[in-house]
Amino acid sequence: MSEKLWEKGYTVDEEVEKFTVGDDYIVDMRIIKYDIKASIVHSKMLQRTGLLTQEEQKKIEEALNELLHLVEEGKFQIKPEDEDCHTAIENFLVKKLGETGKKIHTARSRNDQVLTALRLMYKDELKKIKDLVVELQKSLDGFIERFGQIKFAGFTHTRKAMPTDFATWAGALRDALQDDLKLLETVYDIIDQSPLGTGAGYGVPIEVDREFTAKELGFSRVQWNPIYTQNSRGKFEYLLLHVLSQISYDLNRFASDIIFFSLPEIGFLKLPKELCTGSSIMPHKINPDPLELVRAYHHFVVSRMVMAVSLPSNLILGYHRDLQLLKKPVIESIDVVKNILRIMKIIFDRIEVDREKSEDSITEEVLATHRVYELVKKGIPFRDAYRMVAEKYGREKD
């Protein structure tokens, strides 16, 4: 029988327990390896400060490495009665080591414990997302090398506007992603603070070496104020989701462009059939479903970002169970953004440009603004030149 970390000798109503646990025991499988690694470092700190003997620390570390191996092999699952990964880890240690296992929670709370595991995961995931962004930028460079010189009519208000080329078009996404990388690095730096040792938001009444654990865990610095450390849960998630939403926003806009430009009626771009799906009733349909999902997933991420910024609002300082609900939306959004980055790389690696249809789109009216500036170069005031050209095209349309 699993014991709760907060066990006090009474039994919680079964429905209440199911409600409060929710699917946290499932979600926590994503962070358990980080919690195990942080627990190993925590045990080393306890030994350094005299709260564990060298032999006790060695046994705990060996047991935690065994658990980590089981997790990585898919041979360990958190049970609903464990509630979360923190309880599952401690119960494993107690079952394995007895009294020694009960010492692992000395000088920490589940609050700083989960913050530590989450931030370690966030840092890893941000690195992966950065790599995927860079890979997409390389694909964009390849697209520009193949098709960048081809011109076509750019659009405003979903109407033909002025000439542009595919180097400028694809370069816009590459540059947008570069700004996203700067934002990502800023968010990474903010998250890169160790919360371990702050307890439930008011520190722990015993000596701890927070600088040691921060260094061992790979954090660049310690987040010293214990109240702000707890208050930053929700804030840091919002910042993370904000940068994810910026990436998904840029991909959303370009997915819309590709869908529009690959319309048979437009035809600038050609999507390979293997990147499309079909209709269950209309045999002729070849649909850009992956791009439509890329477009839609931006709204998925934004909705999670709104949840992250609104859920902690109006809470007094300190931990609240409300914050448990942020884990799953953040993890889901991380996975979504990684997936849409991969899909957009595949798209840009394999999409083709129809040179003839693209260049044929630059009809006479698309050059109207250029005609205005030809007159300006002859000394005619811009507004007069504008009206002269506008009148000409107005007559032609009539």
Curated annotation (Swiss-Prot):
Domain of life: Bacteria
Pathway in which the depicted protein is active: Amino-acid biosynthesis; L-arginine biosynthesis; L-arginine from L-ornithine and carbamoyl phosphate: step 3/3
Pfam families: Lyase_1
Compartments, record wording: Cytoplasm
Reaction catalysed by this enzyme: 2-(N(omega)-L-arginino)succinate = fumarate + L-arginine
Keyword Lyase: yes
GO CC entries: cytosol
Keyword terms of this UniProt record: Amino-acid biosynthesis, Arginine biosynthesis, Cytoplasm, Lyase
GO annotation terms (biological process): arginine biosynthetic process via ornithine; L-arginine biosynthetic process
GO molecular function: argininosuccinate lyase activity
Gene3D superfamilies associated with the record: Fumarase/aspartase (C-terminal domain) (1.10.40.30), Fumarase/aspartase (Central domain) (1.20.200.10), Fumarase/aspartase (N-terminal domain) (1.10.275.10)
SUPFAM superfamilies the record matches: L-aspartase-like
Family assignment from sequence similarity: Belongs to the lyase 1 family. Argininosuccinate lyase subfamily.
Annotated protein name in UniProt: Argininosuccinate lyase
Species the sequence originates in: Thermotoga neapolitana (strain ATCC 49049 / DSM 4359 / NBRC 107923 / NS-E)
Underlying gene: argH
